[in-house]
Amino acid sequence: MRSLADFEFNKAPLCEGMILACEAIRRDFPSQDVYDELERLVSLAKEEISQLLPLEEQLEKLIALFYGDWGFKASRGVYRLSDALWLDQVLKNRQGSAVSLGAVLLWVANRLDLPLLPVIFPTQLILRIECPDGEIWLINPFNGESLSEHMLDVWLKGNISPSAELFYEDLDEADNIEVIRKLLDTLKASLMEENQMELALRTSEALLQFNPEDPYEIRDRGLIYAQLDCEHVALNDLSYFVEQCPEDPISEMIRAQINNIAHKHIVLH
């Protein structure tokens, strides 16, 4: 299996990096099935969309296919949030998050030579494409709808701060590795909430391949170990965080957790 640390995410399609990350976490992840389904979608799109059409028309047709005929949509009533992130489940259920739906749409678009790009906007992943006339087209991957600068400004003010302003840098292309790390962060939080602690641990380990000494990720791994009753390793990880980030407001809570684990350890022994 390829190492996440050695893989050049920014030189490969976003979906390929996501598949590699999923493989690192789930031993049963059906990578070949996912690739087969992605290729099937590409073939369907090529049958329906002539590359002789103007770029804008090709993209309009692809969006109509993706959210219309193929039925992809934002996850609604999904029992587990993680199912909106695993690519095999997204392709099976046709429901997903902004990142997972965006990644699938990017795969098909890029195979059609449509220069669609990911953007990590402060509220969610969005997609952008620059048209031949220089106009920038922004797309919401949840539903394929166009996004105006006014709408993005409303999102910022409603979700970040009433005083937040929209800057051009907010619409810059994101590195794939940045998108993958955000996906894994969300996946880890979802798995912890769903009490799928073994998978959450493997997700944390995957994130640590990008930055092995990240105190915040080591803290999260320690909290997961504590849930798995692996007290000794949990103590090591949590203590590392407190040593590295003594001024962090959450350090007091972590110290209390360390004391609880240490006390439990003494009582048991």
Curated annotation (Swiss-Prot):
Which Pfam family, an example, fits this chain? TPR_9
Positions of transmembrane segments: none
Instruction: List the residue ranges forming a coiled coil, or say none.
Output: none
Q: Which family does it belong to?
A: Belongs to the UPF0162 family.
NCBIfam families the record matches: PRK10941.1
| Name this polypeptide is given | UPF0162 protein YchA
Q: What is the lineage of its organism?
A: Bacteria, Pseudomonadati, Pseudomonadota, Gammaproteobacteria, Enterobacterales
Provide the gene name from the record. ychA
